[in-house]
Amino acid sequence: MAHTRPSIAAVVVTHNRLDKLTVTVARLLDQPVDHVIVVDNASTDGTADWLSALDDPRLRVHRSTTNQGGAGGFSVGMQLARDEAQADWTVVMDDDGRPAPGAIDAFRAMDLSGWDAIGAAVHHPDGRICEMNRPYRNPFWNPGAFLRTLARMPLGRGRAGFHLGDGDYRTGSPVLPVDMSSFVGLFLSRAALQGAGLPDPRLFIYGDDQLYTLQMRRAGLRIGFAPQVRFDHDTTALQAQGGVVLRPMWKVFYMYRNALMAYRVAAGPWFWPLVPVLLCKWRRKAADYGPDAALFRTILDQAVRDGLAGRLDRSHDDILRLSRSDAP
């Protein structure tokens, strides 16, 4: 029997980063993908004009009238890939993330039986592993990862206890099961999209990929990490052991509210004992914000209240007012 090549739809979410988007779209159109779906989150930098000038039958552009954030953009794009393109597999990425040359061929060459999703190995353009996209095994579900995390915490290296190691990225390393993979180079089967549904657009930014993939795993879907499928992430965002300093300040709200949402899924019955530890750690971050330390604490407190209540209905305009920000 002849083997049928699975169709692949690529979903890219963009907002006012035309310089990044042009590289990503060119990279995608140079690889054997069947559909390229670009969700333009109300960009004002000429993105719409540039996209309208492209002439490739594989390209489908959805322009939102408002910025829906990454979560809203991925929700729209994944729905289009599932329901309109009806692709066998959908791969998602930000506008600054893109498949390395040969990545799609490497994915097609895989034995995909038994996997509902595949996460790529994400690197910076200079070859360094991109920390913010490093997959992990949930330590609350994996005793080995839990013990490794506890052992490394006194050394300030708890994160290394449950995230994949550098050796797992080496060429020839096996595909490994993981519980979380980011929305940069995550391939989702049609069955996974039908079973797991779509990301919640109310998350706006941050943590949508963690929450989505953790919920996939909790539903029994299998996610693999494939080191041979390589993606580039052209980002300057810094991810250190202590986390990031977020600007503009409205981003603080989404980071910590959504983190609590993800911790609730990950920790299960351990969530409430974990909350005081998280709050103590997070409030210490105020010192990193200098003259904005008091504002950081105000935003954090509201984020925590909403996160603990499971509240996702606060409008973006309300969050902008809370953070005294004019950013969209």
Residue positions per predicted region:
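Short, acidic, metal-binding catalytic loop of nucleotide-sugar glycosyltransferases
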Residues: 26-35
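A conserved acidic beta->alpha catalytic loop
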Residues: 40-49, 66, 97-100
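Glycine-rich, basic loop-to-helix element that forms the pyrophosphate-binding segment
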Residues: 64-84
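Short beta-strand-to-loop acidic/aromatic patch adjacent to the donor-nucleotide binding site
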Residues: 86-98
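Conserved donor NDP-sugar-binding/catalytic core segment of glycosyltransferases
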Residues: 102-143
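A recurrent flexible, glycine/aromatic-enriched loop bordering the glycosyltransferase active site
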Residues: 168-188
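Active-site-adjacent helix/loop segment of glycosyltransferases
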Residues: 176, 214, 218-301, 309
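A short, conserved alpha-helix in the catalytic core of glycosyltransferases
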Residues: 185-186, 191-198, 202-229
